[in-house]
Design a protein with these regions (language model features):
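N-terminal export signals
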Residues: 12-29
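N-terminal secretory signal peptides
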Residues: 1-6
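Interaction-surface and assembly-scaffold signal
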Residues: 35-36, 41-52, 164-351
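Hydrophobic alpha-helical segments and helix pairs
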Residues: 136-185
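Extended, compositionally biased
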Residues: 93-151
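C-terminal region of N-terminal signal peptides and the immediate post-cleavage residues
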Residues: 31-33
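N-terminal ordered "arm"
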Residues: 52-109
Length: 351
């Protein structure tokens, strides 16, 4: 399910088709953002005058040490995941479709602070997280069918070691953030790591949650010479090429061309923001799809990891990662990279 044999002539045909789709959808009004109520119509958020535990956005992540690993997954499972986690909000103008059969595991260790004038005075909070990222195409629903509108990164699961981050992420954006503890890499150039959770190996009326190893990323190979990047453009071009080579063949040439064009844009994150009803436990009192922009502020260093890494996932009833993401309990990565950078998670849009 890859497109590694796209030739130069075919590539330009695909790009031309994408430009045609974009132009048609633009002039028909399909690519316009839907009208949303003004934010000043909402009541003020009551926080007692202090931003803890839920800071005001936007949010600066600085001194970020990041490692990313790409793994093959079952695209049918990823489709089901998007359908039950994103495509259930009736007010959303989009249907999110996995772009490939790949999942990216991202480890990040950083300092997080608010860029809001008031909350920026609080300071920075250390945070470590491990999450899974799925690249999707947001298909806009129109009276004439669906048209590709933009790309979006879906983060179905993120584990974090800091409580304020969990509260802010879940409440503001709808991050599915859960508590975890980590053994961190000694240095980001050789990112061996583990993640533990409070969980259940098996559910049962008498079962008691305890600390369990959820996953491990390791390599038995010795550290090898790495291909480094001197600027963010080089990083972006590398990952854009890998994304183009991994697009599902059943997407068709028009979608492939659209993706080639869309990769030059900033790709937002997408979440399902919801709250369980207090009066009807099986219902949601609030449910919206949220998209939020993520922009690189400063890039310092980065390189592709030359050695292979193995992901080991422990089967837990409370955290069925392999089952929900279409991963194997043990598998080797397709590629990996480390980065040192700062980035900003901006204010989102609720649909």
């Amino acid at each position: 399910l890859t497109n590694r044999n796209v030739g130069r002539r075919d590539f330009f045909k695909i790009i031309g088709g994408a430009l045609g789709i974009s132009a048609i959808s633009y002039y028909l009004g399909f690519r316009d953002k839907p009208d949303l109520p003004p934010s000043d119509a909402s009541p003020d958020y009551a926080d007692g005058g202090i931003g803890l535990p839920v800071f005001r956005g936007p949010y600066l992540q600085k001194d970020v040490n990041l490692a990313a690993f790409l793994f093959r997954a079952d695209v049918n499972v990823l489709t089901q995941l998007c359908d039950r986690s994103l495509n259930i909000a009736p007010s959303s103008p989009y249907r999110y479709v996995p772009l490939s059969s790949n999942v990216m595991l991202v480890y990040a260790d950083m300092l997080v602070s608010s860029l809001d004038e008031r909350d920026a005075q609080i300071g920075s909070i250390p945070e470590t997280e491990v999450g899974f990222w799925v690249l999707t195409v947001a298909m806009q629903k129109t009276s004439n069918g669906e048209v590709p509108h933009h790309l979006a990164w879906f983060l179905p699961t993120v584990f974090v070691d800091e409580s304020n981050s969990i509260a802010t992420g879940r409440e503001v954006y709808g991050f599915n953030k859960q508590a975890g503890t980590f053994s961190k890499p000694q240095d980001i150039y050789s990112p061996h790591l583990t993640a533990d959770v409070l969980g259940f190996k098996q559910f049962g009326g008498e079962a008691i949650a305890q600390k369990e190893r959820l996953l491990e990323v390791s390599s038995s190979a010795s550290e090898q010479t790495q291909t480094s990047w001197s600027d963010w453009r080089s990083v972006r071009d590398f990952f854009a090429g890998e994304i183009m080579n991994s697009i599902r063949a059943d997407m068709g040439s028009a979608i492939i061309g659209f993706v080639a064009q869309a990769l030059v844009d900033h790709i937002p994150l997408v979440f399902l923001k919801q709250a369980r009803s207090a009066s009807s436990a099986e219902k949601a009192s609030y449910q919206k799809v949220v998209e939020a922009p993520l922009q690189i502020k400063d890039f310092f260093a980065g390189a592709r990891l030359a050695q292979s890494y193995k992901l080991s996932i422990t089967p837990l009833d409370s955290h069925p990662l392999a089952q929900s993401l279409g991963l194997q309990s043990e598998q080797t990565n397709l590629l990996g990279a480390w980065l040192k950078l700062d980035f900003v998670l901006g204010l989102g849009t609720e649909y």
